[in-house]
């Protein structure tokens, strides 16, 4: 499950699929994808990955591990339309929502932060202080190319 349909989110959907993951859906809050048309075709359409526009995650399910998310469509103001709720089973939630480290969820989870980078503090395996919770990509620090994010996550 991926939130964000800019080029990085689209390319990560393809990369994760090529690595053996089943990407169930890419959700985008906006009424359009921020990615290039060719990336939508080559990264989603060619792999049968659905893109849901005007859609957001309203709930994350699971205790020790993520077990799924509840999605909902949003209205013109970006507020969830509760009558459109849909559960999506998944064991991973990838946030691809911009080039500035997005750490609101990281901080709320109690993950220690690295003062120098403004991102999550991790060990050599990219595991945070919470056992089983790993961080990579722009949640650690800004990357210039999605290839570097993929390399870091490997």
Q: Whereabouts are the PLM-identified features?
A:
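Residues forming the flavin
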Residues: 1-154
